[in-house]
Every structure is written in structure tokens, then in C-alpha cells.
UniProtKB/Swiss-Prot annotation:
This is Large ribosomal subunit protein uL23. It holds the Pfam family Ribosomal_L23. It comes from Mycolicibacterium paratuberculosis (strain ATCC BAA-968 / K-10) (Mycobacterium paratuberculosis). The keyword Ribonucleoprotein applies. PANTHER family: 60S RIBOSOMAL PROTEIN L23A. One of its GO terms (cellular component) is ribosome. Disulfide bonds: none annotated. Belongs to the universal ribosomal protein uL23 family. One of its GO terms (molecular function) is structural constituent of ribosome. One of the early assembly proteins it binds 23S rRNA. One of the proteins that surrounds the polypeptide exit tunnel on the outside of the ribosome. Forms the main docking site for trigger factor binding to the ribosome. Keywords: Ribonucleoprotein, Ribosomal protein, RNA-binding, rRNA-binding. InterPro entries: Nucleotide-bd_a/b_plait_sf, Ribosomal_uL23-like, Ribosomal_uL23/eL15/eS24_sf, Ribosomal_uL23_CS.
Amino acid sequence: MATVTDPRDIILAPVISEKSYSLLDDNVYTFVVHPDSNKTQIKIAIEKIFSVKVASVNTANRQGKRKRTRTGFGKRKSTKRAIVTLAPGSKPIDLFGAPA
């Protein structure tokens, strides 16, 4: 990904699942990110958007599943996910908009 002016172009959405929800206690957050972004860009974007200190970023490319439809087969789109670990002492990210 070339130069991006807005960090919100890199971080697309948080992943809300049972596994990602259980990792919130360990200050580990999961986001869907732009497929061309790298770990450094993801770290800078998270730090700018949420004003937190990031300790590490792990990424995973997930292939889209082949799904059967009424008229044949289709394919879900592939996504890239970032698993972000916050530094110790960093404030938690409020993903759900409710008091903790």
C-alpha cells in the first residue's frame, strides 16, 4: 500500500467473535485491515486512532470460502486480519461504546 493519509483507510472494522471477545481481557484486539497494509502501517494507524501504545501486531490472511448458491457457486471475499497486542499499562480500547 502506498502512502495513506488517513489511518481509517487501513483499519476497516473490529472483529466481533467469541474468540476475539475472550482476548480483550489480555489487551489483545482483532481488526479487519486493508489487504495491502503491513504491520508497521497497522501499528501506526491503531496508535493514531485510539491513542494507545501497541506492543505487537500479528497478521493473518483469510481466504474467502466457496459457497453454494441457488444458481451455482459463489465466493466470499478474502480478508486480512490484524491481532494487536497493547503494551502493558496502556488504556483499553472501548470497542462497544459502553462503560467498562
